Swiss-Prot record:
Protein name in the entry: Large ribosomal subunit protein uL2
Annotated SUPFAM superfamilies: Nucleic acid-binding proteins (SSF50249), Translation proteins SH3-like domain (SSF50104)
UniProt cross-references to Pfam families, sorted A to Z: Ribosomal_L2, Ribosomal_L2_C
GO BP terms, alphabetized: cytoplasmic translation
The gene coding this protein: rpl2
Compositional bias per record (Basic residues), positions renumbered to this chain: 222-239
UniProt keyword terms in alphabetical order: Ribonucleoprotein, Ribosomal protein, RNA-binding, rRNA-binding
Region (Disordered): 1-21, 203-239
Family named by the database record: Belongs to the universal ribosomal protein uL2 family.
Record's GO cellular component terms: cytosolic large ribosomal subunit
Organism lineage string: Archaea, Methanobacteriati, Methanobacteriota, Thermococci, Thermococcales
InterPro entries: NA-bd_OB-fold (IPR012340), Rib_uL2_dom2 (IPR014722), Ribosomal_uL2 (IPR002171), Ribosomal_uL2_arc_euk (IPR023672), Ribosomal_uL2_C (IPR022669), Ribosomal_uL2_dom3 (IPR014726), Ribosomal_uL2_RNA-bd_dom (IPR022666), Translation_prot_SH3-like_sf (IPR008991)
Superkingdom of origin organism: Archaea
Subunit structure: Part of the 50S ribosomal subunit. Forms a bridge to the 30S subunit in the 70S ribosome.
């Protein structure tokens, strides 16, 4: 009998594949909408921290009503800096306000998908979105992928560019650095190729060092066989 594939083991959910969330700083969400829908709150940045679970640093902010929140830090944020969240917040880096109040051509990040969800889009280090146009019923924003997406005007966003840009410009150089990179998030690494495995471990395994069978697989194949090009319309280089 063959052994389970990596994706079968991952689906079972053993500690090998679980995210080490106990090491992470915590959830990064905006202050609930009912606090800031009518008035603007002032907060002070108390600390900027590294978060192993993210590609950007996070900042701990204490607001004037006593609530403490973690936010994704933008480029240029300082400890002790005052930031504002609400409909009347000034247009400045680090401030959060509804998209309807943000002028066209402004860089924003951590955009809500639905008003009050805390922020879902553009949260990775070095990323930003661009407010393209505003209409009464929607705001058009250009995402980092280049896609133009319409948002509810009441969705909140933070002004600025996410800190941590240029992270990928420095090469890893050696496998030892990659080891620690993946270890921080408990990623299963390195990932062996199927053709390098034994026949008992993978459908493409065995001594021949090539699959030995077509690499296209049915969408309805059973879990132990569903490897390779799944339900592919075509394979290989375009001619």
């Amino acid at each position: 009998m063959g052994k389970s594939l990596i994706q079968q083991r991952r689906g079972k959910g053993s500690p090998t594949f679980k995210s080490p969330s106990h090491r992470f700083r915590g959830a990064v969400k905006y202050i609930p909408l009912n606090y800031t829908q009518e008035k603007t709150l002032r907060g002070v940045v108390e600390e900027i921290m590294h978060d192993p679970g993210r590609t950007a640093p996070v900042a701990r902010v204490k607001f004037e009503n006593g609530i403490e929140k973690l936010i994704i830090a933008p480029e240029g944020l300082l400890v002790g800096q005052e930031i504002y969240i609400g409909p009347d917040a000034p247009i400045a880096v680090g401030n959060t306000l509804p998209l309807a109040k943000i002028p066209e051509g402004t860089y924003v990040y951590n955009i809500e998908g639905i008003p009050g969800d805390g922020g879902k889009y553009v949260r990775a280090g070095g990323t930003y979105a661009l407010v393209v146009s505003r209409e009464p019923d929607k705001v058009i924003v250009q995402l980092p992928s280049g896609e133009l997406k319409a948002f509810n005007p009441m969705c909140r966003a933070t002004i600025g560019v996410v800190a941590g840009g240029g992270r990928l410009e420095k090469p890893l150089v050696k496998a030892g650095k990659a080891y620690y990179k993946y270890k921080a998030r408990n990623k299963f690494w390195p990932t062996p190729r199927g053709v390098k495995m034994n026949a008992v471990n993978h459908p493409f395994g065995g001594k021949e060092h090539h699959p030995g069978k077509p690499t296209t697989t049915s969408r309805r194949a059973p879990p132990g066989r569903k490897v390779g090009h799944i339900a592919a319309r075509r394979t290989g280089r375009r001619k």
